[in-house]
A protein has these predicted regions:
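N-terminal helix-loop segment corresponding to the beta1-alpha1 unit
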Residues: 1-204, 381, 387-410
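Terminal low-complexity tails and localization/encapsulation signals of metabolic enzymes
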Residues: 1-24, 237-238, 248, 254-255, ...
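Short, well-structured beta-strand/strand-turn elements
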Residues: 48, 322-336, 396-401
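Glycine-rich beta-alpha junction loops
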Residues: 55, 142-143, 215-220, 257, ...
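Conserved Rossmann-fold dehydrogenase catalytic segment
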Residues: 144, 172-180, 203-219, 238-245, ...
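Oxidoreductase and adenylate-handling cofactor-binding alpha/beta cores
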Residues: 188-208, 222-232, 275-281
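Beta-strand segments within the central parallel beta-sheet cores of soluble alpha/beta enzyme folds
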Residues: 208-216, 320, 401-405
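Aromatic-enriched alpha-helical interface/lid elements that frame and gate functional surfaces
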Residues: 248-324, 328
Length: 410
């Protein structure tokens, strides 16, 4: 038995969102960032055609363990609501198929470096004359220009370039990667946002757009609340285990049993905290009158709060802080997140039926008219929609499809 057994099923009556139903997206990406971007578009209702290498498919299909019924769970995390077509675009017959699909698509998404795009004739300059309305969206490690534009890149590499690893962890520890593929997910989110903007603009002027997303740039923008203060002050932030926030009290504290997070983000919350814990006089001291004052005396304040919170279990403090509108929360493990009744009720975490049994999913998490239901189609098996796409999009008959398959084109 796996943890998904307690998850609610996606409601088939809901049918998913259809906000982007007219949009057709041709997705030639692999790994996480690009597929995450196109899953966001698919969740909103776009038709996403995932073009994969015959026999191998998306790199994430081989990422594991863990696997579920021989399917990579990493692959399952970023590929729902899509259709899979296997196609060797390097063969002339494969390129002919791709050109037919491009003629019927609104968006092309790539995560090939510029050199490979040019080699395959899939760069913006090679396509814009034949497909002037096509939105050409490129997601690479370092963008389409610059000295690193042809460098390969993964999330780990982008995090290192952007400075986030140097800020993550304890001061005495080595730099640490963020606990999720943050650069992948942020760059993917940026691409989805950019596609929506380009789609709106095309509706106004009828032309396509070249979109250039860099994982390094997306991740660098992510650290702007730390980078900008350095640029303006010259004070270089260092790893601190999350204890160096501009907010004086904004960190994790131990309690009598489990740790909690606490954020006293303004003067009103500061006063409410000390009222709640029964020591309003401490909170009213003039040397703690503002956040700047409290930062000066942070060490003494942290010692006092730590002493207080160790006296009672976490549940006691969270109930008290909720009553007094004080921002605080648990430090959940993923197994606890997976059992959060609010997330389950909203179907953010759910399971869906697939050809080989039930699969777990994490939804979009955005409500539209009171609903967060996005599931229309489980992540596809490799090439499961190839014949349907060739027939439905391009009008190919059975013998022509069979010939392509025999030649290894599909």
């Amino acid at each position: 038995m796996t943890p998904q057994e307690h998850l609610p099923y996606a409601d088939p009556e809901k049918g998913g969102l259809k906000l982007l139903a007219p949009l057709r997206v041709l997705d030639l990406t692999t790994s996480i960032a690009g597929p995450y971007a196109t899953q966001l578009l698919a969740d909103l209702g776009a038709t996403v055609l995932k073009v994969e290498k015959p026999g191998a498919g998306d790199d994430t299909r081989a990422w594991g363990p863990p696997f579920l019924q021989d399917v990579s769970l990493w692959y399952l995390s970023v590929n729902r609501n899509k259709h899979s077509l296997t196609l060797d675009v390097s063969q002339p017959a494969g390129r002919e198929v791709l050109d037919g699909l491009l003629a019927q698509s609104d968006v092309l998404v790539l995560n090939m470096v510029p050199r490979v795009q040019r080699k395959l004739g899939l760069d913006y300059d090679s396509l814009k004359a034949a497909y002037p309305a096509l939105i050409h969206a490129s997601l690479t490690g370092f963008g389409l220009t610059g000295p690193r534009s042809d460098f390969p890149c993964y999330d780990l590499i982008a995090e290192g370039y952007a400075g986030i690893m140097d800020l993550t962890g304890e001061l005495e520890s080595a730099p640490q990667k963020v606990g999720t593929p943050a650069a992948d997910l942020l760059a993917g989110q940026d691409l989805a946002l950019a596609v929506l903007a380009a789609y709106i603009a095309r509706g106004q002027h009828g032309r396509g757009t070249q979109i250039d997303i860099s994982m390094q740039s997306s991740m660098t923008r992510f650290v702007s609340p730390r980078l900008l203060p350095y640029l303006g002050s010259g004070e270089l932030p260092r790893r601190s285990g999350g204890k160096d926030s501009v907010i004086a009290i904004y960190q994790v504290f131990d309690t009598a049993d489990d740790p909690l997070s606490l954020g006293l983000g303004n003067d009103r919350i500061w006063q409410r905290f000390w009222q709640a814990v029964g020591d309003p006089a401490f909170g009213a001291r003039t040397e703690f009158a503002s956040n700047a004052h409290r930062r000066t005396h942070r060490e003494a304040i942290v010692m006092r709060i730590a002493e207080l919170l160790r006296a009672q279990p976490r549940a006691h403090w969270l109930a008290l802080f909720a009553e007094h509108s004080i921002p605080a929360g648990p430090i959940n493990r993923l197994d606890q997140v997976a059992q959060d009744p609010d997330l389950l009720d909203k179907r953010l975490i759910y399971r869906a039926r697939a050809s080989n049994g039930a699969i777990p999913q994490v939804g979009l998490g955005i409500g539209f008219d009171g609903s967060q239901h996005v599931h229309r189609k489980s992540p596809p098996a490799l090439g499961e929609d190839t014949d349907d796409v060739l027939r439905g999009w391009l009008g190919y008959a059975g013998p022509r499809i069979d010939a392509l398959r025999e030649r290894g084109v599909i």
